[in-house]
Amino acid sequence: LGFNYAPRNYYIQNENRRVTFVNAGPEYYGNIQIGIPNVFQSYFEYSQVKLGLTVRKLWGAIGRTRINGEVNALFGVVPSPLQTVYVGNQSFIYNTQAYNQMRIFEFVSDRSISGTFEHHFNGFLLNRVPLIKKLKWRSIVGAKVIFGSLDSANYKLIPKEYNGVQISTFKALDNGPY
């Protein structure tokens, strides 16, 4: 069950599709997941609550800024795929949805606070240099932060080996700085 409240967005809809126009301003969202054992062949009893806020600001010729904050809490003992798994990006290409230079599926947590800051200059800096302007490169400044923890009961469910072969596993965020 989830909600999304964006008071400044507006929609255009016809018979076949609905298009959302995102304006500068706040967007509030949330999600609640509940696991009930023996319903749809489920084995786990848990509840997960996620609340977030996204703020967009347009700065005219200077660019646009997006700030996002999110709080996540999981109650119950579940295996790592049902916990919050953070997506890493090992390439040098920027991905707004992933944590860059972090390995794919490296960290999990059951309680976390995360934040993202992104500013897109929209050519404000690089369009002043003639040769770089032809490449149509854009400059972006950003930062991403996660603080989280993993309950010891959930940590024990992370497998360390498979058929006698040691495998690389998920790590908890509370093992020190990355």
Task: Describe each model-derived feature in a short phrase.
Residues 1-178:
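Exposed, low-structure sequence patches enriched in small/polar residues
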